Amino acid sequence: MTARALDELVEPGWAKALEPVADQVTAMGQFLRAELAAGRKYLPAGPNVLRAFTFPFDQVRILIVGQDPYPTPGHAVGLSFSVAPDVRPLPRSLSNIFQEYADDLGYPMPACGDLTPWAQRGVMLLNRVLTVRPSNPASHRGKGWEAVTECAIRALAARSQPMVAILWGRDASTLKPMLADGDCASIESPHPSPLSASRGFFGSRPFSRANELLTGRGADPIDWRLP
């Protein structure tokens, strides 16, 4: 992650929304450069760390929050749950998301794990912590990203436009108080990981329910179709 001004790293709407934590973003860039200087790598690659904030702030209608990036080298791409198009096999959580997607919407299983089309259509795929040390899950929790992503979540919720937050798992459900401002609905279920998917994630219909909540608030539904 390069030492550049926030408005050079993210979309203009996000630059304004994240202005209260601009110094924290700078500090996190310094932290990551110090990690590299000490011989410790991080994921995703530098240009993708803030990728979730490169899509228009004003167009976000769905928020899906992950915990931290995939720690497997080659998997994390800066969007929660998404992987690069060539990744095989898919992470188990993403495979379960796709199974529910197919069951809920009746679409065929996607050909790859790239969720970029969702991000382009107004789905914010945000990890609570934006980086991780390879093969070391949760290694960057408590380092400072939480303040940045809390600011992002609160800024989204405070807009005067409808949004639905899809909260998978207990960690995500703790974010609900941040969504109290504005016209924001939420859908909660167990996490899609293999440890909990069978306890209520499967059958939860998050995609169709989110669209029902959006249209009920006068907003356009999301086109969830993936190639």
Curated annotation (Swiss-Prot):
DNA damage recorded as keyword: yes
One Gene Ontology term from the biological process aspect of the record: base-excision repair, AP site formation via deaminated base removal
SUPFAM superfamilies: Uracil-DNA glycosylase-like (SSF52141)
SMART domains with a match to the protein in the record: UDG (SM00986), UreE_C (SM00987)
Catalyses which reaction(s): Hydrolyzes single-stranded DNA or mismatched double-stranded DNA and polynucleotides, releasing free uracil
Pfam families the record matches: UDG (PF03167)
GO cellular component, one term: cytoplasm
GO molecular function: uracil DNA N-glycosylase activity
InterPro entries xref list: UDG_fam1, Ura-DNA_Glyclase_AS, Uracil-DNA_glycosylase-like, Uracil-DNA_glycosylase-like_sf
PROSITE patterns: U_DNA_GLYCOSYLASE
Keywords, in A-Z order: Cytoplasm, DNA damage, DNA repair, Hydrolase
Statement: the UniProt record of this protein carries the keyword Hydrolase: yes
UniProt-annotated catalytic positions: D68 (proton acceptor)
Similarity comment: family membership: Belongs to the uracil-DNA glycosylase (UDG) superfamily. UNG family.
Protein name: Uracil-DNA glycosylase
Organism: Mycobacterium marinum (strain ATCC BAA-535 / M)
